[in-house]
Amino acid sequence: MKKFLALVLSLCLVLSLAACGGKPADDDTAEGSKTGGTIQVGLNSAPVSMNIWCQNDLNSATIMNLVCPNLVTIDDDGNKYDYLTESSESNEDCTVWTIKLKELYWNDGTPVTSADLLFTAKYGVEHHIGFFDSYYGLVDFEKSSCPDERTVEFALTSGNVNFWKGAGNWIPVMRESEWSSVEEPTTYSYSGAGYGPYYVSEWVDGEYVTLKRNPYFTQANDGAGACIDEVVFRVYTDENAMVLALQNGEVDVCANFLSASSISQLQSNSNYQIESVGSLGYTLLTFSQSNELLQDVNVRKALAASCDREALVNVAMSGAATPMYTPISPVYSDFTASNIRQPEFDTAAAASILENAGYVDTNGDGIRESADGKPLSFTITYKGTMANVDGIMSILSSDFAKAGVELKLQPVDAATFSANVTQGHKYDISYSSWGTIDDVDTTLLTIFGIGQTLNFMEFNSQEQEDLLNAMQSETDYNKRVELLNQWQSWFVENLPCCHLFVPNNTYAADTTNFTGWHLSPGNSAFLACANFVNVHAK
């Protein structure tokens, strides 16, 4: 078993850095009196790795958001704000952005500098890591600079009205002294160093992750830093095991949102703080363009018309979701006012689309074939630990069959999903859930752009690319909405994927030993860095 021991502060290192680095947070404050204790956190599946720059696993991101937090975060109303940056300003056409960092220190007392931030952007783009091309791809590094130790001036090749809202919210800072010598970032085992309230002390794959308090983090509780000394993330096989651990007192909080059946088991106990928040993301099916049959828009339209959103929401999700008929989430009312809709549920219409396109069942097995005899039989890959996923798959496979399409179920763990779908692009159809899709009038390029990391279906369209690029640089809001409507019309005609519903995410925390739990929109729920630093022992 792989076992990782992260950086540990030694006395000699602390002494050597005392003169030029930060000093430990002062515990002699009102909040400082609340410091101490260990919180146990339940995870419904194993995190992939602490190298969150190179993969897109939610549980890994939840852990590492306490270690290397994003510099921009989301408030209770779903609005983004500068969290670990003092300010972010642009010129009139949004081609120059000036970002000023707050005083941040790695857990050995070394300052986080503007050079680290500029290095992060350049290194990620040069190595084509994850989201870097999406958020920093417009940066002209020859013209960008660091005027002082905490200020970066990013010069862009064209305007982007939400440049920092995107980059700051999605890409944590990389430590230049650690990463500059790394030639292959995707296989690199990160040290676990943190500039947030914690650093990784121990990471045991498939079992647990232990975080220790960063004594140099002062951006909470009037300079005192985080209240809790240690956070242990424990891995369980599925949601049921995680919830049982909460009931047995093995964990204090569940990191993942819970199904309606799990909530019903907990809600009678007044010790549990149970809160819901509307997701900023949504569930979806993606159609891999590596499969020749799925390259046919008629097949994609038929599959989309076989998705019964009402049944998915009311039966599989027990009402804890909102159907998503438009390409954009209904959370964003301005952007869905045009009511441009995906195909309505109608399996007879789906069958007719396929029949007219030449897909017929020639051998009576219930599965249609193409003109050259290839059956419309697809494997759907999904994380087996997703909430209510068995019911969702039952509804989808039954309705697809009515149109003459076979859906073969392939539940996998998070690491396999990442390897086969988001990283490997070796699949037919995937079912997954975006945690957060934000700034949709400018950041859809990160999902659908040619060669973008999240475009793992490899649906590459220059017409779409031009629309998405135009949205990014348009400074007039109303004109961006017009462009977005053009894109939505393009989407429903081409269907690179099919959007299903927006979950109403419900989370649970035990208040027996700890208090201060607070829920905001976003991926990390009770564990969101800006909120979790205030959780303390009773």
Regions found by a protein language model. Name each.
Residues 42-92, 122, 193:
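N-terminal lobe/hinge region of extracytoplasmic solute-binding protein
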Residues 43-61, 84-86, 110, 163-172, ...:
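A structural "hinge/loop" feature
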Residues 86-130, 153, 293-295:
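Aromatic- and charge-enriched surface segment that lines or borders ligand/interaction sites
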Residues 186, 216-264, 406-408, 413-414:
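Ligand-site clamp/hinge motif
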Residues 204, 208, 306-337, 388-397, ...:
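Detector for C-terminal structural segments
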